């Protein structure tokens, strides 16, 4: 660009400037099509041969030109207004968009020096797309500027919102696919404007890419009229701006005009909020961008429309190395962008076009927020000893684990209030999950009207977002908050974390790929998920609320990037959370009790359990370092309590029985194929090679069975959740699943040859008390006194 255009007097709406924008757009489109089809001859300087074309062109075209158009105009707005902006590519299967644009702006070459901005580099760029050993057809972690892959649809706005929290100068230009808009999470996420503060947070700018079609169907919103769409988005609290058309020349002018209005509207909102301390919810602008699917591509094929049709979705014309009979049509398409006007003899973008591209960190692909690990500040954490319950008399005192954790979280918020890099999320469950102490130092962030005393704990600024009953929203915002370098947690009912288990899978894939395949990405704070109101504490809500399967779901992944913690009491939970919240590049699942329970471990004991992942509990063992008769292993709150009660029964009846009691906190450390897993020798030192192991476990039995399959000791008896539940008493939940103390005693005696016969009378005693339990709860509606009044007695 000329010096005059670089000056402050530039007319960003002039025909000259928009001509350059159009040229840039054409260049991005050319490169995007080239990535689909070409191996060689990237600029078509020679006649196209079969060896120039891929054997299997793979990828998608339908969304590309529209997004490239949007990207080009966002660049223009960045230049005009000096914006701090990054791009989120919501539509599925549009990987070329961010690759092509980061290549044109130089970020791609800076990241991958072999992909040079010339003919040789363009050839490499084209070959690698959707190619073995190359790059994906989505904006995966290898893509500069991406924090959102867009493989599984529905999370674009949520990721934009999580990124702009506590980033008041940042704009997340979030392109939403009209197919994506039909997903549950995306339909929900239009409500994020009720949670973003115009003073302390940045701005999400949704751009609905209304191209009309999905894979083979029309999109719902595209068939609504202009008036219906306007009413719909206004009703959701947005101010929609429309850019609609098919003629590129006209669309450039419309887009420039409307985008200017949008940016000026954003600036006016922010200025008013800051100048007048006005934290009322503004009507943030958004853009409805209606242009044809497959815009600028082939108009038709074999008598049927392509542009403006679902047929533009993938590879629009059938040309590959083995089918070159229509190669001239591919050449016509590529040459329609006039590459000779865009690239010089070396294949480099012409300088007059490159001059309108933002520079340095102003480039969306180079925005520092998209490599958030480099922005991460260390979290300031409290001393966990300050929250220690005494517990020297093991089990003497009752307490709520989550209530105690709430005190730690309260102080974590206070310690990091200046850095503003810690938040919590929940779907209207923070109080229910007993984290109420956190509200001693903060409020729920909420931008809607507040009606006290009917409302409570709401404010325009707060470190907890839990006023939207959407697990998708919580998970999505936390993911982006982490990916942009900040810390947080998401606490929910255990069974309803299954709502987002596919989101957790997608985040796991991002963490793994970014760590293993993109050394230029710095590790980011871990995603911390607290599963409370667990299956065994849902006696009052019943069977629908009882599903502990989230741990099995995560354990199936590469566990180098997953931790599954099952703390047995409050001290262990606090030590676990303190470790998890400071970790990087992991998904930490913490399964935590919220109801009052006996408190077992001193803080020193808890620290050792969390450090080592498991440990022999000396005060609950009678083997004194010798080979035990039976091993009790526990993972979880109720399993620990019930196993200790079982040990006390056995010891009272058979004081000579040698029992080893193991508490497991970090379950996946037992896996042989986990990088942190115990060696066989270490495993055998805990569990022996052949002695019976009574493993009381919080979730489904099969996970523990799978873990032990690769170990020497197969004398395993797992008592977990066996899909038995109802509205009943707390103890009956354990009885139904044979996780209670009486079933555990029976299992231990039957599995230990020396005691199977001489313990027959005790087995009968256990059966009798189980019969009593059955009748008693149905008559009284509460658990038997033997359970309600039980206390741990030190073993002699």
From Swiss-Prot:
GO biological process annotation, one example: carbohydrate metabolic process
Keywords for the protein's UniProt record, in alphabetical order: Lyase, Thiamine pyrophosphate
Record-listed E.C. numbers: 4.1.2.-
GO MF: aldehyde-lyase activity
EC supergroup of this enzyme: lyase
InterPro entries, per the entry: Phosphoketolase, THDP-binding, Transketo_C/PFOR_II, Xul5P/Fru6P_PKetolase, Xul5P/Fru6P_PKetolase_C, Xul5P/Fru6P_PKetolase_CS, Xul5P/Fru6P_PKetolase_N, Xul5P/Fru6P_PKetolase_ThDP_BS
Pfam families noted in UniProt: XFP, XFP_C, XFP_N
Keyword Lyase annotated: yes
Record carries keyword Cytoplasm: no
Cofactor(s) this protein cannot do without: thiamine diphosphate
Assigned protein family: Belongs to the XFP family.
Name recorded for this polypeptide: Probable phosphoketolase 2
Organism of derivation: Lactiplantibacillus plantarum (strain ATCC BAA-793 / NCIMB 8826 / WCFS1) (Lactobacillus plantarum)
């Amino acid at each position: 660009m000329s010096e005059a255009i670089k000056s402050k007097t530039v007319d960003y709406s002039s025909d000259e400037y928009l001509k350059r924008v159009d040229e840039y757009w054409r260049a991005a489109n050319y490169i995007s099509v080239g990535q689909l089809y070409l191996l060689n001859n990237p600029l078509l300087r020679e006649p196209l041969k079969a060896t120039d074309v891929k054997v299997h062109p793979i990828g998608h075209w339908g969304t590309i030109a529209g997004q490239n158009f949007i990207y080009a105009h966002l660049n223009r707005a960045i230049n005009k207004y000096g914006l701090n902006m990054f791009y989120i590519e919501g539509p599925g299967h549009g990987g070329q968009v961010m690759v092509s644009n980061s290549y044109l702006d130089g970020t791609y070459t800076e990241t991958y020096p072999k992909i040079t901005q010339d003919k040789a580099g363009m050839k490499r760029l084209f070959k690698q797309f959707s190619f073995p050993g190359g790059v994906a057809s989505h904006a995966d972690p290898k893509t500069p500027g991406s924090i959102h892959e867009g493989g599984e649809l529905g999370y674009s706005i949520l990721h934009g919102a999580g990124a702009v929290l506590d980033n008041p100068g940042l704009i997340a230009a979030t392109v939403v696919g009209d197919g994506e808009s039909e997903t549950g999470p995306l339909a929900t996420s239009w409500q994020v404007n009720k949670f973003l503060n115009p003073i302390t947070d940045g701005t999400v700018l949704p751009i609905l890419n209304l191209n009309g079609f999905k894979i083979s169907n029309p999109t719902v919103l595209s068939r609504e009229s202009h008036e219906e769409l306007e009413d719909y988005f206004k009703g959701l609290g947005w101010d929609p701006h429309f850019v609609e058309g098919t003629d590129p020349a006209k669309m450039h002018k419309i887009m420039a005009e409307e985008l200017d209005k949008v940016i000026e509207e954003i600036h006016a909102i922010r200025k008013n909020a800051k100048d007048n301390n006005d934290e009322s919810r503004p009507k943030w602008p958004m853009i409805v961008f209606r242009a044809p699917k497959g815009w600028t591509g082939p108009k038709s094929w074999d008598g049927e429309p392509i542009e403006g049709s679902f047929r533009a979705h993938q590879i629009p014309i059938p040309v590959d190395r083995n089918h070159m009979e229509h190669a001239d049509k591919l050449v016509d398409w590529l040459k329609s962008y006039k590459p000779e006007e865009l690239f010089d003899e070396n294949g480099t973008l012409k300088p007059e076009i490159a001059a309108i591209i933002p520079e340095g960190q102003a480039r969306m692909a180079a925005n520092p927020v998209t490599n958030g690990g480099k922005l991460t500040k260390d979290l300031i954490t409290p001393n966990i000893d300050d929250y220690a319950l005494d517990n020297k008399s093991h089990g003497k005192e009752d307490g709520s684990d989550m209530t105690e954790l709430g005190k730690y979280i309260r102080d974590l918020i206070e310690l990091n209030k200046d850095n503003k890099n810690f938040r919590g999320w929940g779907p209207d469950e923070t109080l229910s999950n007993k984290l109420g102490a956190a509200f001693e130092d903060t409020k729920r962030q909420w931008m809607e009207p507040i009606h006290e005393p009917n409302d409570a704990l709401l404010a325009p600024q707060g470190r907890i977002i839990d006023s939207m009953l959407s697990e998708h929203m919580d998970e999505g915002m936390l993911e982006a908050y982490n990916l942009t370098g900040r810390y947080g947690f998401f606490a929910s009912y255990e069974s309803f974390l299954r709502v987002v288990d596919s989101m957790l899978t997608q985040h796991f894939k991002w963490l793994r790929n970014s760590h293993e395949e993109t050394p230029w990405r710095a590790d980011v704070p871990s995603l911390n998920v607290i599963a409370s109101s667990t299956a065994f504490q849902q006696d009052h809500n019943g069977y629908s609320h009882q599903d502990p399967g989230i741990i099995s779901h995560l354990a199936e992944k590469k566990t180098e990037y997953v931790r599954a913690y099952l703390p047995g009491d409050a001290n262990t939970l606090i030590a676990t959370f303190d470790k998890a919240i400071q970790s990087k590049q992991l998904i930490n699942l913490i399964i935590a009790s919220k109801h009052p329970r006996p408190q077992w471990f001193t803080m020193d004991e808890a620290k050792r359990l969390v450090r080592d992942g498991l440990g022999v509990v000396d005060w609950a063992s009678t083997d004194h370092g010798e080979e035990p008769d039976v091993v009790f292993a526990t993972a979880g709150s109720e399993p620990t309590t019930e196993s200790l009660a079982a040990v006390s029964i056995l010891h009272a009846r058979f004081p000579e029985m040698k029992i080893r009691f193991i508490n497991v906190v970090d379950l996946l450390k037992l896996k042989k194929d986990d990088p942190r897993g115990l060696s066989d020798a270490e495993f055998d030192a805990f569990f022996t090679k052949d002695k019976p192991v009574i493993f009381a476990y919080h979730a489904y039995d099969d996970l523990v069975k799978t873990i032990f399959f690769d170990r020497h000791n197969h004398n395993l008896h797992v008592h977990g959740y066996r899909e038995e539940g109802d509205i009943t008493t707390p103890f009956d939940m354990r009885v139904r699943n044979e996780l209670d103390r009486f079933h555990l005693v029976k299992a231990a005696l039957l599995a230990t040859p020396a005691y199977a016969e001489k313990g027959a009378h005790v087995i009968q005693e256990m059966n009798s008390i189980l019969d009593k339990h059955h009748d008693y709860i149905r008559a009284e509606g509460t658990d038997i006194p033997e359970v309600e009044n039980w206390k741990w007695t030190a073993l002699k």
